[in-house]
Amino acid sequence: MNEINNILPKYSDAEIERFDSEDKFMDAYVELLKQTIELIYRVVGLRYCDPEGVPKKIDKEEAVVGGNLIRLIKLNTSFLQNICEGKLEICYIINRCIAETAINTKFLLIEGEERVKRNYIKNSLITEKELWETIITNVKDRSGDVLPIEERMQRSIQNSFDKSDFDLGEVKRSSKWKSIKDRANLVAGEMFYSVFYGISSHSIHGNWQDILLNNLKKIEDGFELNLQWNRPRPQIIDGAIILNLDIVKIFCERELQNDTTASLIIEKCKTLNDYHADLTQNHEKWMLK
């Protein structure tokens, strides 16, 4: 409890107003991102671990949400590392993954029903089923000759189905799991998909826009290759901070009702959200100078 009480804004409003360089804003943003990651750790510990911090046995429905929270933690720590190493291009890629994981987690928490979580699992097994069918076709074309790598792949696929409590015959080529756009619109609004998620697709797929902005330099009537990493600026961290705090808050409300520690964590989310808004506002003013 004391450790959670100690999660406080690093700088006061007056100190932020006196920032005279972007490095100072970056320091504040990085420390805030760390605190949001710590809050995710805290709710995971409250819900899925024993008093000693050892993970408890959980059922499949719990594992769907809990596993997504762990993915969110791992993505955030990798994001933080690349921020500190000054690798903006990698940050763009991880940022997109953070967004989709947060969307999935919030959707699963809001919908909450067993069928929704089952559709989430079933949808991920479609690709595995397609690979299984490709192997079967290839083996048939070779008159039943199975390659060692195909045997290993089939064992791996069967293992995934067994752990997920699905039979191969249950999974078809279509799924009732909503598209990422529909999930994003439901939990974050239409602008989120178009602006935050959609634009970040450039970095994931290596579209021309990503190549142009991050990997080339325009010179006169041609280009030069850009071998240097681009330096992250505070704005790249905004999305992760907002999403992390949103997920922590809704998780506490849905999964940790009447827990006094969870109530304190919700208060911390509000405090850090207000602090982030203050940072953002002052950084915007600073950029206009």
What are the roles of these predicted feature ranges?
Residues 91-93, 109-119, 258-266:
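Short, glycine/acidic-rich hinge or "gate" loops at secondary-structure transitions
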